[in-house]
């Protein structure tokens, strides 16, 4: 029950803050995608799609989850598979598994939303329409591509045709300008959105940055370059320090990112980065105003759109 206990603790925290928790299966038995870094796929073992046993385990897992949380009002929904990416012609096998999971969930829980991601990292819904449940949402992800006014035209007709909500369930890994433009696009089309991730280790593009401690860096060096192997105790201490650094109060808060996501999509106004600047005095270059490019600051390289353009642009 260790995994369930973690979810229970999260729900206990979320309830007084009136925050919904969406359960998203990132590592299905065998792995739902070829990307080993996010789906735990092992090329030497059968994937989710190559093993009936793995499929049955996935169905049983979701039924067990639904049995436990069927009456919890702070579960926002069940996101059945995160970013499946496999050769699944016509989406037949993907839909078949989704329907099996949905049926298993509905045996014990007829209340919570079923969230369906497309193939190819949640962006290919071939074979996944029409919806097979009356309480279903289609969820796509968006990374590193353009944010023009017509960039959701590939998926908006699916919502209108089938009268089913859309949710942009994951995005991020870009610049503040891209964040503002993307949120503006979603909200102009009444598409809900969620960002990844709230906290990241050593990141410059998440609201909270987790500091890397010296011991953890030694572990990374050992894994990556074959550096000196840390002792078991040193490794344990480093990981516990990293866990402590991950507490919100110990993170570096990047309020410019929150501002780009929550305020800037709705205004051209700029606001001071700090309210304590005084002249005469020192104003650091990095403390430019919070606001959009060409308003709070001026920059030529403001985002990367390499999924659309085919070439990567370093924005930072």
Residue locations for each model-derived region?
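An active-site-proximal structural segment forming one wall of the substrate-binding cleft
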Residues: 1-77, 97-104
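Generic secondary-structure boundary/loop-capping signal
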Residues: 45-46, 140, 195, 280, ...
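Short clusters of hydrophobic/aromatic residues that line enzyme substrate/ligand-binding pockets
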Residues: 48-49, 204, 297
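Extracellular glycoside hydrolase catalytic/binding regions
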Residues: 59-63, 67-200, 205-220
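Aromatic-rich peripheral "rim/lid" segments of glycoside hydrolase catalytic domains that contact
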Residues: 178-181, 185-278, 302
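Extracytoplasmic
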Residues: 257-316
């Amino acid at each position: 029950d260790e995994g369930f206990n973690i979810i229970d603790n999260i729900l206990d925290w979320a309830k007084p803050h009136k925050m919904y928790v969406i359960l998203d299966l990132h590592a299905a038995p065998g792995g739902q995608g070829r990307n080993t870094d996010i789906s735990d796929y092992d090329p030497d073992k059968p994937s989710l799609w190559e093993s009936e046993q793995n499929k049955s385990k996935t169905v049983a897992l979701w039924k067990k989850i639904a049995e436990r949380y069927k009456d919890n009002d702070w579960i926002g929904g069940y996101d059945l598979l995160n970013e499946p990416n496999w050769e699944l012609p016509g989406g037949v096998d993907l839909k078949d598994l989704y329907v099996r999971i949905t049926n298993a969930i509905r045996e014990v829980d007829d209340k919570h939303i079923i969230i369906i991601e497309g193939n190819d990292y949640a962006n290919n819904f071939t074979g996944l329409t029409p919806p097979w449940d009356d309480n279903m949402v289609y969820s796509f992800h968006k990374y590193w591509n353009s944010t023009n006014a017509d960039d959701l035209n590939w998926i908006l007709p699916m919502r209108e045709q089938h009268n089913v909500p859309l949710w942009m369930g994951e995005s991020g890994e870009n610049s503040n300008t891209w964040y503002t433009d993307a949120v503006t696009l979603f909200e102009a089309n009444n598409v809900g959105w969620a960002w990844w991730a709230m906290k990241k280790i050593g990141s410059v593009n998440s609201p909270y940055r987790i500091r890397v401690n010296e011991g953890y860096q030694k572990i990374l060096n050992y894994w990556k370059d074959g550096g000196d192997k840390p002792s078991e105790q040193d490794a344990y201490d480093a990981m516990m320090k990293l866990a402590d650094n991950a507490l919100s109060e110990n993170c570096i808060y990047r309020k410019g990112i929150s501002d780009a996501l929550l305020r800037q999509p709705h205004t051209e106004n700029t606001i001071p980065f700090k309210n304590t600047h005084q002249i005469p005095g020192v104003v650091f270059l990095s403390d430019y105003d919070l606001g959009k490019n060409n308003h709070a600051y001026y920059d030529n390289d403001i985002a990367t759109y390499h999924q659309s353009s085919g070439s990567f642009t370093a924005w930072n």
